[in-house]
């Protein structure tokens, strides 16, 4: 199994956990197929504007984060997901440490992310790691428009 295959398998299990309960399973599946497939991860892994960082256990990918360089000195933390069995183990904090170090190595001034306004667990984690709410945005998922908070962490 390639890293792209493993990442797609983890994404298929973890992305639905971050979605509000009202989102229809077919909309989640459609998003996963379009954006989190093995083929898409193969593209992401070769894209010089992206970095995919992994959390591993016994050599297997159990979580990942994806960073995207902007045209300015901002970096988007596009995704950060862990398999449920690894929540509360310190794996997310270790992955976030890699995220911030990579962004700093790229010369970023700040890292930003979007998190669903109903995902309080993720919001608490991001706040604990220094992110602050800086605005809102909408995220289309199927026929629905979900409301996200934009959270930012300054690096300098």
UniProtKB/Swiss-Prot annotation:
Keywords: Acyltransferase, Transferase. It comes from the Bacteria. Its EC number is 2.3.1.-. GO terms for molecular function: acyltransferase activity, transferring groups other than amino-acyl groups. InterPro entries: Acyl_CoA_acyltransferase, Bact_Acetyltransf, GNAT_dom. It is an enzyme of class 2 (transferase). Signal peptide: none annotated. Residues 10-156 form the N-acetyltransferase domain. It holds the Pfam family Acetyltransf_1. The keyword Acyltransferase applies. Belongs to the acetyltransferase family. This is Uncharacterized N-acetyltransferase Mb2688. It comes from Mycobacterium bovis (strain ATCC BAA-935 / AF2122/97).
């Amino acid at each position: 199994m390639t890293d792209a295959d493993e990442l797609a398998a983890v994404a298929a299990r973890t992305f639905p956990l971050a979605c509000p309960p009202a989102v229809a399973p077919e909309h989640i599946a459609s998003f996963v197929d379009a954006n989190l497939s093995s083929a898409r991860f193969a593209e992401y892994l070769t894209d010089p504007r992206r970095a995919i960082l992994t959390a591993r256990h016994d050599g297997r990918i159990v979580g990942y984060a994806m960073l995207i360089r902007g045209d300015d000195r901002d970096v988007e933390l596009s995704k950060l997901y862990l398999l449920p069995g690894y929540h509360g183990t310190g794996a997310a904090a270790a992955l976030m440490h890699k995220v911030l170090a990579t962004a700093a190595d790229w010369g970023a001034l700040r890292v930003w992310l979007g998190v669903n306004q109903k995902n309080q667990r993720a919001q608490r984690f991001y706040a604990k790691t220094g992110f602050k709410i800086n605005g809102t945005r909408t995220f289309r998922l199927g026929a629905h428009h979900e409301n996200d908070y934009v959270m930012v962490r300054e690096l300098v």
